[in-house]
C-alpha cells in the first residue's frame, strides 16, 4: 500500500556512553569500547547493525551501497561512539541511518520511518504497540497491537501480532 519505497530513515540512539564510563568502572563500557576485546567498530558495530537490519527487514530491500561518517565524540575513547550513514538500497531507494551512544538522556531509542510513493509508516521501539501510517490522499492512521480493526490491511497487521494490546 505504501507503493514503491523511496526513502528510509532509521535511527538508534542511546546515551549511556555520554561520559568516559569505561574509565569509571563500568565493565560493560570497558569491553565495548576496547578494540582488542570488541573489534574495530564501536557504536556502528554495536547498535548501528541493528538499525540496518531493521531497515532491510521492514522495507524488504537490501542495502547495496553506503557512505559513513563515524565519530568519536567523547575525548579519550578508542572507538566510534556516534555516526551517520547514507544508504542506497535495491530498487534505487535511499536512506539515512544514524546511531549514537552519546545522545545524553536517551535509553534505547530505535526508530524507523519508511516512505513510498503513496505514503509512509513510522515505528519506534519505545512505543512498540503503535504503528503510524501516513497517506498522501487521506488522514494519518495509528494502529495499535491487539486492537480489532476491520479493514483488510489493519486486520492483517493485527493477525500477525503475537501479543495482546498493551504488551510489548
Predicted feature locations:
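Glycine-rich beta-alpha junction loops
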Residues: 10-16, 70-74, 91-93, 101-103, ...
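Beta-strand scaffold of nucleotide-dependent catalytic cores
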Residues: 5-8, 96-100, 123-124
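Substrate-positioning beta->alpha
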Residues: 50, 78-83, 89
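Glycine/proline-rich active-site loop of Rossmann-fold NAD(P)-dependent oxidoreductases
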Residues: 61-62, 77-79, 93, 106-110, ...
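Glycine-rich phosphate/pyrophosphate-binding beta-alpha loops
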Residues: 49, 75, 98-106
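Predominantly a Rossmann-like dinucleotide-binding segment in NAD(P)-dependent oxidoreductases
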Residues: 1-77, 131
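C-terminal glycine/acidic-rich active-site capping loop/insertion
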Residues: 24, 28, 32, 57, ...
Amino acid at each position: 500500500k505504501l507503493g514503491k519505497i523511496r526513502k528510509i530513515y532509521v535511527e538508534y540512539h542511546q546515551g549511556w556512553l555520554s561520559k568516559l564510563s569505561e574509565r569509571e568502572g563500568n565493565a560493560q563500557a570497558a569491553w565495548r569500547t576496547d578494540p582488542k576485546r570488541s573489534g574495530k567498530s564501536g557504536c556502528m558495530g554495536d547498535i548501528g547493525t541493528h538499525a540496518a537490519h531493521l531497515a532491510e527487514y521492514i522495507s524488504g530491500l537490501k542495502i547495496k551501497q553506503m557512505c559513513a561518517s563515524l565519530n568519536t565524540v567523547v575525548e579519550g575513547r578508542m572507538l566510534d561512539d556516534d555516526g551517520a550513514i547514507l544508504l542506497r538500497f535495491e530498487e534505487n531507494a535511499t536512506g539515512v541511518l544514524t546511531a549514537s551512544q552519546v545522545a545524553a538522556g536517551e535509553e534505547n531509542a530505535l526508530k524507523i520511518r519508511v516512505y513510498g510513493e503513496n505514503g509512509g509508516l513510522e515505528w519506534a521501539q519505545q512505543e512498540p504497540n503503535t504503528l503510524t501510517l501516513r497517506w498522501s490522499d487521506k488522514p494519518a492512521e495509528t494502529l495499535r497491537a491487539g486492537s480489532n480493526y476491520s479493514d483488510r490491511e489493519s486486520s492483517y497487521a493485527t493477525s500477525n501480532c503475537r501479543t495482546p494490546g498493551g504488551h510489548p
